[in-house]
From Swiss-Prot:
The lineage of its organism: Bacteria, Pseudomonadati, Acidobacteriota, Terriglobia, Bryobacterales. Belongs to the NAD kinase family. This is NAD kinase. Involved in the regulation of the intracellular balance of NAD and NADP, and is a key enzyme in the biosynthesis of NADP. Catalyzes specifically the phosphorylation on 2'-hydroxyl of the adenosine moiety of NAD to yield NADP. One of its GO terms (molecular function) is NAD binding. It is found in: Cytoplasm. Its EC number is 2.7.1.23.
């Protein structure tokens, strides 16, 4: 990682922990000659430092510190977009599966990161496009997943699904989760999907409550192009990206998902390994 000249800070809203940390963190960085850019939420905790829209924070940054939970990290990832700037995620939330650095570890681990004594985990992004009448009307990059669900009342939806032009099936279910390896430990896991090691080049199709005993989750290569078309009435289906943004899907729209050429860079302490986090955060393998 290059020398850190400018660092960004993105924070969780309404967080007493962030309110306590932010002024000290800004001062800590400035004492080391590092310029600081903060979002408008963080400015509320800063004691007078002006903020900017979250999407502008990563501009000119060499590193972005994220103070919050996994939801804050997903929001920060969306703000960073395709810039591939390292994120230093500090857990102020609950589970904190991705934001696995604790408050107590903040300054020691940040000091190590500034010295280059850290590990960068690359998490592949997934591009999702909505095609309507042969035009791309919406495009998103997902870290975790793209989820197609019924938009309102409790009813099943019909989703014609293809992988590389090969017909998979017509899912009749509450929805369909298209998950990256990173997203395999999120919504997909709750819906019965497998845990995928982060470096495995795959995409997982996990139906939500399918009305068919044989509709099990399916892994496909990350080189695959997945196409899903709704057969329901207009706007009976909703597409959600990483649980935070989305758009209604009309009948005959096609949702196309494929692996992006870009990755999210997560700073990890050298000792922090995937299965350690599984055991600590998800109690995986406990008896």
């Amino acid at each position: 990682m290059p020398i850190i000249k400018t660092a960004g800070i993105i924070s969780k809203p309404n967080s007493t922990a962030a309110e306590e940390i932010v002024p000290k963190l800004i001062e800590w960085l400035r004492r080391r000659g590092i310029a600081v850019r903060i979002d408008e939420q963080t400015s509320l905790y800063s004691g007078g430092v002006s903020g900017m829209p979250r999407e502008e924070v990563p501009q000119s940054c060499d590193l972005v510190v994220v103070l919050g939970g996994d939801g804050t990290l997903l929001s920060a990832a969306r703000a960073i977009g395709r810039r591939e700037i390292p994120l230093f995620p500090v857990n102020l939330g609950g589970l904190g599966f991705l934001t696995a650095i604790s408050i107590e570890e903040l300054y020691p681990e940040l000091e190590r990161a500034l010295r280059g004594e850290h590990r960068i985990a690359k998490r592949k992004l997934m591009t999702t496009e909505v095609i309507r009448e042969n035009n791309v009307i919406a495009s998103f990059d997902a870290l975790n997943d793209a989820v197609l669900t019924k938009s309102s009342i409790a009813r099943m939806i019909d989703l014609d699904t293809y992988v590389d032009e090969q017909f998979v099936c017509a899912y009749k279910a509450d929805g369909l989760i298209i998950a990256t390896p990173t997203g395999s430990t999120a919504y997909s896991l709750s819906a019965g999907g497998p845990i995928i090691f982060p470096s495995v080049p795959a995409i997982c199709l996990t139906p939500i409550c399918p009305h068919m005993l044989t509709n099990r989750p399916v892994l496909v290569p990350e080189t695959s192009v997945i196409r899903v078309a709704s057969r329901g009435p207009d706007e009976s289906v909703y597409l959600t990206i990483d649980g935070q943004v989305g758009t209604p899907i009309r009948e005959h729209d096609t949702v196309v998902c494929h692996s992006s050429h870009h990755s999210l860079l997560l700073i990890r302490p050298p000792r922090m390994m995937f299965f350690d986090v599984l055991r600590q955060k998800l109690k995986w393998g406990e008896r």
